[in-house]
């Protein structure tokens, strides 16, 4: 026995040492260097370099502005704001569809050191009043209508001068951004007020500004409680938008078609600012999302890039192509906001020529992009991951105790770097919950998203923690079920949620949009069998709901930025199941 023990000891010394386990923490490149300029300085620099190049095109208004046009118009509006007494740090609200005046106001506010509060187009009057009150806006730029959404109730209630009329404690004046409305000042009036100002007034104000000043409040699209307003700086936005454009290989010859709204980081930063930082051109096809207008813009303007969330691309691809449609110039763009189903990706490559599309991940609090694929990444990488971490950013994945997990293990994604918000406006409690400083003095943003890194640093988002379905103690991830269901020839789109269940805690429920050419919907059992062909039995949906049936609206509920509102789907599911139960009980009584 002693001889055997000695032999075992000898062999154990001969074995190679175990390789240390790699942890899920990554850092982005340190080049190119960060720019230390304000948004106003950025626009001045780009107008000097690209002055006569077209910058903004709005087919629906007829506007075609060069870089010089944009700079000059922003200066005129900025002088008007100074004449109206706007001080550094004052909040200015804006609620409108995509239009050229929106962008001139954005840069004008930045030039005078004001903080632009971008307001969601889908806000109800009460949501708008909350946002205005929470941020104490002094001015509000508004249009009486945004698409089919009327804001006349707001105009009637607040009046032209709300503070003076006693309808608001802080809001001094409402400005009509486009067109006219009886009794209200207009965008043109703002410009006229600035005409008498001395020529040096704007330069004097700009000399007081710094790149680390807050210039933008972006409300998060939270589904519970009041939304929080993330404070973003010039430094955040200038640099994040540069790096986004770099990941798409944008040049001054590129033309981006941008359906996402300007009130969201997707349209404002990934779209407009990414273009401005690269001397490119951007096309906003319509006031609000219109898939027909997008198709015309792609073809008529010879676009090389296209942005959107998956629901937008689904809508675009569901339409017949216009006569003489040409997308041969299209190569890249960003798909973000929600996971991309494999069948949709295949169609983007085959039907829209987006061979260099990039996947992306970000959130408002990070200005927004944290990860973005390269155009040279393989199709499989771009489909299954959101690429690698952006320059000058760090990312880690932690467990519930806050420890960094090994590579290949799921956990909560956290972000650090220059792009983090300064916090939530007037909300220190929520700021402290989201921004955590570690023992090394590094501040990390807890995203609330579950993710996984591979050994090369590619990141895959595996779900929102709040969307994960826990069935009998086992985690089920909606994305893989959605992808499997969407691969069925009869299904156009699938959205999966958790349904409360007495036995298992939660079970799987699936909302389906049927393909246009389907004559009869597949049975529930057929769809379960389809799911079980590639996924475990417990992942097959117990309940199915079809848009346009059983009182469910035909339209998929989405946020203003195009993300599916799963919180609404859960409410709809509860209502439908209640009706089904009542119907079953009535039949039994007979």
Curated annotation (Swiss-Prot):
Kindly list the cysteine pairs connected by disulfide bridges: none
Motif PTS2-type peroxisomal targeting signal: positions: 6-14
Q: In which pathway does it act?
A: Siderophore biosynthesis
**Carries keyword Cell membrane?**
no
For molecular function, the Gene Ontology terms on record are:
ATP binding; medium-chain fatty acid-CoA ligase activity
InterPro entries in alphabetical order: AMP-bd_C, AMP-bd_C_sf, AMP-binding_CS, AMP-dep_synth/lig_dom, ANL_N_sf
Key words of the record:
ATP-binding, Ligase, Nucleotide-binding, Peroxisome
What EC number(s) would the UniProt record show?
6.2.1.-
Which effects follow disruption of this gene? Answer: Blocks TAFC biosynthesis, decreases resistance to oxidative stress, and attenuates virulence in a murine model of invasive pulmonary aspergillosis.
Instruction: State where the protein is found.
Output: Peroxisome
Binding-site positions, CoA? 472-474, 543-545
Q: Where does substrate bind?
A: 364
Q: Which family does it belong to?
A: Belongs to the ATP-dependent AMP-binding enzyme family.
The name this protein goes by in its record: Acyl-CoA ligase sidI
Q: Which species?
A: Aspergillus fumigatus (strain ATCC MYA-4609 / CBS 101355 / FGSC A1100 / Af293)
């Amino acid at each position: 026995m002693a001889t055997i023990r000695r032999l075992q000891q000898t062999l154990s010394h001969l074995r190679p040492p175990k390789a240390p386990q790699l942890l899920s923490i990554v850092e982005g490149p340190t080049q190119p260097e960060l720019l230390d300029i304000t948004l106003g300085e950025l626009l001045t620099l780009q107008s000097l370099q690209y002055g006569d190049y077209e910058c903004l095109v709005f087919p629906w208004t007829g506007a075609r502005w060069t870089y010089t046009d944009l700079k000059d118009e922003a200066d005129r509006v900025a002088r008007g704001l100074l004449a109206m007494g706007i001080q550094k740090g004052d909040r200015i609200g804006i609620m409108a569809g995509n239009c050229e005046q929106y962008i001139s106001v954005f840069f004008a506010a930045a030039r005078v050191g004001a903080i632009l509060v971008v307001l969601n187009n889908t806000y109800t009057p009460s949501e708008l009043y909350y946002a205005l009150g929470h941020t104490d806006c002094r001015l509000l730029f508004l249009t009486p209508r945004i698409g089919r959404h009327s804001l006349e109730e707001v105009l009637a209630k607040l009046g032209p001068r709300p503070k003076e009329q006693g309808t608001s404690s802080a809001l001094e004046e409402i400005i009509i951004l486009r067109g006219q409305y009886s009794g209200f000042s207009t965008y043109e009036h703002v410009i006229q007020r600035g005409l008498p100002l001395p020529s040096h007034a704007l330069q004097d104000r700009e000399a007081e500004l710094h790149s680390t000043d807050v210039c933008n409040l972006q409300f998060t699209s939270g589904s519970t409680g009041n939304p929080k307003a993330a404070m973003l700086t010039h430094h955040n936005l200038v640099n994040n938008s540069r790096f986004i454009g770099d990941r798409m290989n944008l040049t001054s010859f590129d033309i981006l078609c941008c359906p996402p709204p300007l009130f969201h980081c997707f349209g404002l930063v990934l779209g407009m600012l990414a273009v401005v930082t690269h001397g490119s051109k951007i096309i906003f096809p319509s006031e609000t999302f219109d898939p027909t207008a997008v198709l015309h813009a792609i073809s008529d303007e010879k676009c090389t890039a296209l942005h959107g969330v998956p629901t937008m691309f689904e809508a675009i691809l569901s339409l017949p192509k216009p006569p003489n449609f040409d997308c041969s110039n299209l190569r890249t763009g960003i798909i973000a906001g929600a996971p991309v189903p494999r069948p949709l990706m295949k169609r983007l490559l085959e039907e829209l020529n987006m061979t260099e599309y990039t996947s992306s991940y970000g959130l408002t609090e990070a200005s927004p992009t944290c990860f973005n694929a390269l155009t040279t990444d393989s199709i499989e990488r771009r489909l299954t991951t959101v690429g690698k971490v952006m320059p000058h950013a760090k990312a880690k994945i932690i467990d519930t105790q806050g420890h960094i997990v090994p590579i290949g293990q799921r956990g909560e994604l956290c972000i650090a770097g220059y792009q983090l918000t300064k916090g939530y406006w007037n909300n220190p409690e929520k700021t402290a919950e989201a921004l955590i400083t570690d023992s090394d003095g590094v501040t990390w943003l807890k995203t609330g998203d579950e993710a996984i890194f591979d050994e090369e640093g590619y990141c895959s988002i595996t779900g929102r923690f709040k969307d994960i379905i826990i069935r009998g103690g086992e985690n089920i991830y909606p994305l893989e079920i959605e992808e499997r269901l969407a691969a069925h020839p009869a299904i156009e789109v699938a959205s999966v949620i958790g349904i409360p269940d007495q036995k298992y805690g939660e079970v799987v429920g699936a909302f389906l949009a049927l393909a246009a050419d389907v004559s009869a919907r597949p049975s529930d059992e057929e769809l379960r069998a389809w799911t079980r062909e590639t996924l475990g039995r417990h992942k097959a949906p117990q309940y199915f709901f079809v848009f346009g049936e059983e009182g469910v609206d035909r339209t998929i509920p989405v946020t203003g930025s195009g993300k599916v509102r799963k919180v609404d789907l859960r409410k709809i599911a509860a209502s439908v199941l209640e009706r089904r139960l009542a119907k079953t009980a009535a039949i039994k009584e007979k």
